[in-house]
């Protein structure tokens, strides 16, 4: 079970349930400083995002974003550790069950078509849980939502907001309703930045770095009610 203490949660951290969907939306999952750090760090090393096909990472016309590795076996950035710790606590698994972690950028018009986060490939099988964290804000005119077609839910990007869902049960049965798409941001110069955490039921990478210190920075403030486009629903009040 996770051993990371609760003080690694930003102040204002709150979990909301999207009724009858299995989705959780977490506001203030990361701080403004963490989001800015991840964007600036990733921008230096972006490459074309790929998909897994026949156990190989390949280019695909259905995924047009770019990404950068934020944390892996040979490069363990201590600034990313508190984010992994929070994710592990919510997923109910140890930190070292996280896969290699990416920051992704979607520029104007870029997208990722509908897909699952699990497959029969060894490179993406046994993904128990996904935590998708937005690193910047987009308004209703800028698009960029994460759209769950089967659930008829679209979540708008908001800096510090995370969406959490379970991909598979311990017995290996899959949650087919978790098919989702990254809708394109709209507008010249518009970008969407996210960081993805995928957790498995077994160790992926031993964590060599240590959590540095107590986290005292406040999370990104909540901003009251939101005006959402038709068909979009994001919880803003009912906490669980």
Task: Please report, for each region that a protein language model flagged, where it lies by residue.
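Fe(II)/2-oxoglutarate oxygenase catalytic core
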Residues: 1-164, 168-240
């Amino acid at each position: 079970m996770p051993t990371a203490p609760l003080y690694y949660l930003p102040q204002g951290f709150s979990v909301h349930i999207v009724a009858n969907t299995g989705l959780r939306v977490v506001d203030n999952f990361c701080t403004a400083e963490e989001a800015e750090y991840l964007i600036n760090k990733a921008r230096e090393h972006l490459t074309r995002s790929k998909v897994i096909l026949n156990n190989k990472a390949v280019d695909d016309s259905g995924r047009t974003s770019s990404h950068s590795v934020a944390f892996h076996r040979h490069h363990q950035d201590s600034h990313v550790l508190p984010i992994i710790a929070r994710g592990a606590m919510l997923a109910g698994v140890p930190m070292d069950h996280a896969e290699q972690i990416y920051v992704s950028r979607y520029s104007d018009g870029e997208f990722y078509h509908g897909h699952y986060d699990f497959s029969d490939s060894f490179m993406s099988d046994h993904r128990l849980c996904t935590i998708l964290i937005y690193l910047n804000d987009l308004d209703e005119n800028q698009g960029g939502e994460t759209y769950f077609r089967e659930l008829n839910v679209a979540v708008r990007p908001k800096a510090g907001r995370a969406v959490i869902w379970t991909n598979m049960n311990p017995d290996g049965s899959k949650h087919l309703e978790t098919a989702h798409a990254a809708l394109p941001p709209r507008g010249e110069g518009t970008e969407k930045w996210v960081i993805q955490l995928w957790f498995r039921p077994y160790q992926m990478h031993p964590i060599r770095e240590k959590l540095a210190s107590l986290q005292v920075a406040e999370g990104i403030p909540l901003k009251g009610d939101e005006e959402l486009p038709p068909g979009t629903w994001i919880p803003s009040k009912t906490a669980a």
